[in-house]
UniProtKB/Swiss-Prot annotation:
Compositionally biased tracts (Low complexity): 955-964, 972-982, 1033-1049, 1099-1118
Name of protein: Transient receptor potential protein
PANTHER family, per database record: TRANSIENT RECEPTOR POTENTIAL CHANNEL, TRANSIENT RECEPTOR POTENTIAL PROTEIN
Any one annotated GO CC term: rhabdomere
Region feature (Disordered): 933-1275
Organism of derivation: Drosophila melanogaster (Fruit fly)
Record's subunit section: The C-terminus interacts with a PDZ domain of inaD to form the core of the inaD signaling complex. Other members of the complex include norpA (PLC), inaC (PKC), and possibly trpl, ninaC, Fkbp59, calmodulin and rhodopsin. Forms homomultimers and heteromultimers with trpl. Interaction with trpl is mediated in part by the N-terminal region and the transmembrane domains. Also interacts, though to a lower extent, with Trpgamma.
Gene expressing this chain: trp
Annotated keywords: ANK repeat, Calcium, Calcium channel, Calcium transport, Calmodulin-binding, Cell membrane, Cell projection, Ion channel, Ion transport, Membrane, Olfaction, Repeat, Sensory transduction, Transmembrane, Transmembrane helix, Transport, Vision
NCBIfam families (UniProt xref): trp
Protein topology in the membrane: Multi-pass membrane protein
């Protein structure tokens, strides 16, 4: 087992090395290939055509050859933006490779569209796309790059729009902590590629164009993606710079949308929208909730919050209720603020007694609320200062009344365990009010939001100190009275005799600490000032640097403290004994002053660390090391350690702290305005909220508002229906505004791109056009027998630019990029070392890991959708048709109001018992079904001559057959029987006469004739002269004209699904050859498609709902069976083949239909088949089906292709049908029979429903918390 494991590891390592070191094999270009690549580089279309016509298929020429830079002719055409050359190369079946990615990288839109259509036409289901199948050693792009990702990297709006309209999807990255099998395998196989693929995916998701096109709420998407990138930035610190850059891009996009808000209404809608269901739904004209701005503050979107438009809106809300305040002078503003501050008790009482009065409403204004709360807090700080200065005692001493002096003396005797004084009682009341306010804030915001604000942490710490002070004072009172009442001990004695940890001393320490934090809270209040605010932000940043510094400083302090304490503790004990030689509790400072001073320096680890800390400020001298009984070596070693500590701490660490603080201040000063506005906005938003209007300590008093809530008098709650309608209105209004902003943003970005000056690409394009024109003129002159000497010699000097010369030199001199031959041989012959670490990793990997709380495989399966890198043209057309359908529904929203009531009752008799309003509602909800029923009823009544019945779509998307009833079906059968009899007479005459118009060859020679016809386009041939006369038969109603490829045959009933719809009759001049003749210029494929579609555009019926294509038009109903076929009718299928590239010279047709049964041998049972055949069978084919066909589809036909074939079709066929077949029957077939026969169409892809995104059509796929809502397609 061990040997097998080791061999597997060696094989895996060997394959990985082979992959990593795999290089493209050196290939020496022939002279023809060199000329071919140079002609493509110069844009020489005639030269390229000539080489392709002369040498394609020979050993001297390979159309897929590459230049030394590993560029094929197709990539060269894309880089030079030569569309005609690209089309020619595609027509000659060049390998596409990663040309689509190159076109996207070059931002060549026309090439992208053409290559997307090529991929859709030639790609087989289950096979890799062309850029995925390319050799990784030769590819320019990594494996994880898809067209949509690359287009997002280029941030090209137009290409992204094309791909998203086609339904292309983006492979979503899994969560960074995902532990599914796919992520674990990818991480173990190649961790670098795994991380880079994640970076590429997030770089695509961060593209502004992709967010604008794919997200219904771009601002929310930008916020959430920025927060996730911040998390990735912390978890994958190796790629911190990349994630930081992407995060900055996303933040800039969200902020740039604010630049395009033109009115206050747009800005209010943008900032007040709440994407989560809530009871408070904002509408225009109501009090602003600013939910989106709160979300921006929560996600730390500082540039978004500090935007001038946002700040203007916040300032307008902040100074609401004080008109003209901002235009007053500073002295007048100060007077107004003082008046408001001094009157805060009056306003508070008004609000408590009458919450709905004018004074109470005025107090709810944000600025007034801020002034009242600030003045209340200032009064609390005044009380703290009065308690610290012992104002009561000083007042008693100044007044010096006898009773006051007596009271003061008694208080000093009973200071331990005394009750709080009047100022302390007021402070305790304030503390209770402040704690109550903090609890309300914690309840409303939640624990997470409360902790995120650092000033709430400061409030929590100060309140904890105050609570400790109150508890310690209560404990001291209990202890004192316990000793006094129960133990009979006098607890009152001077302070110097108290225990070191007496509760009174502990309470004073806690009160002092709480006082410090309370005064520091003023910094937060001063952040509203434009001068003090930036300083407060800088101070906060420096505190973070100090905390980082103290982590290292504490480590150094503890290390040297342990060392010095180990050296000097014994000698410190000797000094202590000298100090306390008289009494253990009394120090002899008179005789042993030095010993009493220095013994504490190194007595224990705590004292040693304190000494080293104060040594940083120069408060410890070297005399402290002259301890009693210390030895010279010990003193020297201690001094050496103290010196080392001083160098590391004072010179290195302290200067590093100064440098860090300077750097932080420099960073803050560069963006001081943004940081300050963000901090000020946080302060403003805290006063915009409802509640907390009354400042402390009045918030402890019950008010009328609270009493009404307690007694049950609440506002009437909104119903769910009302909430849902309000949410829909808010969502609709927000969508309209966001569409406007996104459209303005994209327009501005496109204009900014177009405003660039002349670039190098423009010069290259002009040079390419001039070069192509030169060679075209030379070709024209040569074809007209002009004397053009030395064309080849002159063409070699076309590339006069530096890049052109370098490229030509490399091609002509066979320059190759690769290993030096000797070095490559040495590397291949060197012995690979044994990989011990991989074996060790396999042994460790056998251990079972702890089972986590999350099943990552289940999460990945749940959040995974089928990937479609490029989508399809069908999806793009469906999107446009859905928009048209949606617009039509909106325009006809009230159509049911004018509908005839009688017709409604006839349509549904149950409507006679309901009111008119109910009938109108029924019409609105059932309009689609009523319209479909009307169309079906019209089809059942019968169509005009030559018009087949339309087949409705079933749930699976296939067309169901509708059998026409009544006498129309009998007439069709009689006409079909007469037509078969006439055709049989024609066949017998043709077989007897042996005219050139029929097949006079035996059946065995049929195959050879077919191959010959495939290689050479057939010439226009006239039908047999012995055909039926004009008066013999009438055409079958709805059957259409006879098929041009089989004038003497009738198709089997089951063959309608296997053949293309008959092409409409065209003029003789419209016939196009299947392939260009030598020396002629081939028409590009796109032009051929355009010409083909323009011919059939007029005959297309209107599209049905959902953008489903209509069936192919049939021939006119007045076409007669004996009419001669026009040459264009026979050539139309050939032109279609040449255009779509669906046939190749070396491919053979095969299928159950070969050889076809002649119509002349039809038995009476065939009449039953024709009866079952529907008039619209030939119209079921869509015009676009021929584009999707491939040559191999005929052999790969699935049983589902015959699902419309009825069970009785095979039973009606008699056993003697094949036996009665005559040799002359096969003679009647023309060579064009097999030529015109086309393979079955590929299965259609599922259509996207109305309102459904392309990602939702394929199912949801693996995505993280944020990026799962990205590709939801709403434009």
């Amino acid at each position: 087992m061990g040997s097998n494991t080791e061999s597997d590891a060696e094989k895996a390592l060997g394959s990985r090395l082979d992959y990593d070191l795999m290089m493209a094999e050196e290939y020496i270009l022939s002279d023809v290939e060199k000329n071919f690549i140079l002609s493509c580089e110069r844009g020489d279309l005639p030269g390229v055509k000539k080489i392709l016509e002369e040498y394609q298929g020979t050993d001297k020429f390979n159309i897929n050859c590459t230049d030394p830079m590993n560029r094929s002719a197709l990539i060269s055409a894309i880089e030079n933006e030569n569309f005609d050359l690209m089309v020619i190369l595609l027509e000659h079946n060049i390998e596409v490779g990663d040309a689509l990615l190159h076109a996207i990288s070059e931002e060549y839109v026309e090439a992208v569209e053409e290559l997307l259509q090529w991929e859709e036409t030639n790609h087989k289901e289950g096979q890799p796309y062309s850029w995925e199948a390319v050799d990784r050693s030769k590819s320019t792009f990594t494996v994880d790059i898809t067209p949509l990702i690359l287009a997002a990297h280029r941030n090209n709006y137009e290409i992204l729009k094309i791909l998203l309209d086609r339904g292309a999807t983006l492979p979503m990255p899994h969560d960074v902590k995902c532990g599914c099998d796919e992520c674990v395998t990818s991480q173990m196989t190649d961790s670098l590629r795994h991380s880079q693929s994640r970076i590429n995916a997030y770089r695509a998701l961060s593209a502004s164009s992709l967010i604008a096109l794919s997200s219904r709420d771009p601002v929310l998407t930008a916020f959430q993606l920025s927060w996730e990138l911040k998390r990735l930035q912390a978890m994958e610190s190796e790629f911190r710079a990349e994630y930081t850059e992407m995060r900055q891009m996303v933040q800039d996009f969200g902020t740039s949308l604010l630049d395009h808000a033109r009115t206050s209404m747009e800005l209010e809608v943008m900032l007040n929208f709440n994407h989560e269901p809530s009871h408070d739904i904002w509408c225009l004209g109501q009090r602003q909730t600013l939910e989106r701005l709160k979300l921006a503050i929560r996600y730390k979107q500082k540039t978004f919050v500090a935007h001038p438009n946002v700040q203007q809106l916040l300032a307008a809300i902040w100074y609401d209720g004080l008109p003209g305040f901002r235009r007053k002078q500073a002295s007048q503003q100060l007077m107004d603020v003082v008046k408001l501050g001094c009157s805060f008790p009056i306003y508070s009482l008004k609000y408590i007694l009458a919450p709905d009065s004018e004074g109470a409403k005025f107090m709810r204004k944000p600025f007034v609320k801020f002034i009242t709360h600030s003045c209340s807090y200032m009064f609390f700080l005044m009380l703290l200062g009065a308690a610290s200065l012992r104002v009561v005692q000083i007042t008693f001493e100044l007044l010096a009344f006898p009773w006051m002096l007596t009271m003061l003396e008694d208080w000093r005797k009973h200071e331990r365990g005394s009750l709080p004084g009047p100022i302390e009682l007021a402070i305790i009341t304030y503390i209770m009010a402040l704690i109550f306010e903090e609890l309300k804030s914690l309840y409303s915001d939640g624990l997470f939001e409360y902790i995120m604000d650092l000033w709430n942490i400061v409030d929590y710490i100060s309140n904890m100190f105050y609570v400790t002070w109150i508890l310690c004072r209560a404990t001291a009172w209990v202890i004192v009275h316990r000793d006094l009442w129960f133990r009979g001990i006098d607890p009152y004695f001077p302070r110097e005799h108290w225990h070191p940890f007496d509760p009174m001393l502990l309470s004073e320490g806690a009160f002092a600490a709480g006082m410090v934090f309370s005064y520091l809270k003023l910094v937060h209040i001063f952040s509203i000032n434009p001068h003090l605010g930036p300083l407060q932000v800088s101070l906060g940043r420096m505190i973070i640097d100090i905390i980082k510094f103290f982590f290292i400083y504490t480590l150094v302090l503890f290390a040297f403290g342990c060392g010095l304490n180990q050296l000097l503790w014994y000698y410190a004990e000797l000094e202590k004994n000298k100090c306390y030689h008289l009494h253990p509790d009394v120090a002899d400072f008179d005789d042993q002053e030095k010993a009493c001073t220095i013994w504490r320096r190194f007595s224990n680890l705590f004292e040693t660390s304190q000494s080293l800390f104060w040594a940083s400020f120069g408060l410890v001298d070297l005399v402290s090391f002259d301890l009693a009984g210390i030895k010279s070596f010990t003193r020297f070693w201690a001094l050496l350690m103290f010196g080392s500590y001083s160098v590391i701490n004072i010179i290195v660490l302290l200067n590093m702290l100064i440098a860090m603080m300077s750097n932080s201040y420099q960073i803050i000063s560069e963006r001081a305005d943004t940081e300050w506005k963000f901090a000020r906005s946080q302060l403003w938003m805290s006063y915009f909220e409802d509640g907390g209007t009354i400042p402390p300590p009045f918030n402890l008093c019950p008010n009328m508002k609270m009493l009404r809530k307690t007694l049950g008098r609440k506002r009437p709650s909104r119903t769910k229906s009302f909430m849902r309608k309000s949410m829909e209105r808010a969502q609709t209004l927000h969508d309209k505004v966001m569409k406007l902003l996104v459209r303005r943003y994209i327009t501005a970005e496109q204009r900014r791109r177009d405003d660039y000056g002349i670039t190098e690409d423009d010069i290259i394009e002009v040079r390419q056009d001039i070069s192509s024109l030169r060679f075209e003129l030379l070709e024209i002159f040569t074809n007209n027998n002009w004397d053009v000497p030395d064309i080849e010699k002159k063409s070699q000097g076309v590339a006069r630019t530096t890049k052109g010369k370098v490229m030509e030199r490399r091609i002509l001199k066979d320059f190759q990029i690769g290993f030096v031959e000797n070095l490559k041989q040495e590397m291949s012959e060197s012995e690979s070392g044994r990989d011990i670490f991989s074996s060790l990793a396999k042994v460790i990997g056998r251990k079972k890991t702890q089972k986590g709380d999350k099943d990552w495989n289940a999460i990945a399966r749940k959040n995974t959708f089928a990937s479609d890198p490029i989508g399809s043209k069908r999806s793009s057309m469906q999107r446009h048709s859905q928009r048209s359908l949606r617009r039509k529904i909106i325009e006809q929203a009230n159509e049911g109001l004018q509908m005839n009531q009688t017709q409604l009752i006839e349509f549904n008799p149950n409507l006679g018992d309901v009111t008119r309003a109910t009938r109108v509602a029924y019409v609105k909800f059932m309009r689609k079904k009523m319209a479909a029923d009307e169309v079906s009823l019209a089809d059942d009544e019968g169509a005009p001559n030559g018009e087949g019945e339309k087949k409705p779509l079933d749930a699976s998307g296939s067309k169901k057959s509708i059998t026409s009833g009544g006498t129309g079906g009998g007439a069709s059968m009689l006409a079909a029987a007469a037509l078969r009899a006439s055709v049989k007479n024609v066949d017998e005459k043709s077989g007897a006469d042996g005219k050139p118009g029929t097949m006079g060859k035996p059946t065995d020679d049929k195959k050879a004739g077919d191959d010959k016809d495939k290689q050479q386009p057939p010439k226009d041939s006239k039908p047999s002269a012995g055909g039926p006369k004009p008066g013999d038969q009438k055409p079958t109603p709805g059957a259409g004209a006879p098929k041009p490829q089989a004038a003497g045959t009738i198709s089997k009933p089951g063959e309608s699904q296997k053949k293309d719809a008959p092409a409409p009759p065209t003029k003789p001049g419209d016939t196009k050859p299947a392939a260009p003749k030598p020396g002629e210029s081939a028409k590009p494929e796109a032009a051929a498609k355009k010409e083909e579609s323009s011919k059939t555009e007029a005959s297309k019926p209107a599209a049905t709902n959902g953008a489903a294509k209509s069936a192919a038009p049939s021939a006119p109903s007045d076409a007669k069976p004996d009419s001669k076929l026009k040459p264009g009718a026979a050539g139309a299928p050939e032109a279609t083949k040449a255009t779509n590239g669906a046939s190749k010279p070396d491919e053979k047709k095969s299928g159950p239909e070969e050889p076809k049964k002649a119509a002349g041998d039809s038995k009476p049972g065939d009449d039953a088949k024709d009866k079952d055949k529907k008039p619209g069978d030939d119209k079921d084919k869509k015009p676009g089906d021929d584009k999707d066909k491939k040559p191999a589809d005929n052999n790969d036909k699935k049983p589902a292709d015959d699902k419309d074939k009825k069970p009785g079709d095979d039973k009606d066929k008699k056993p003697g049908d094949d036996k009665d077949k005559k040799p002359s029957d096969d003679k009647d077939k023309k060579p064009a029979d097999d030529k015109d026969k086309k393979p079955a169409a590929a299965p259609l892809k599922p259509a996207i429903k109305v309102g459904q995104s392309s990602a939702a059509a394929g199912g949801e796929r693996g995505k993280s918390t944020v990026t799962g809502r990205m590709i939801s397609g709403w434009l």
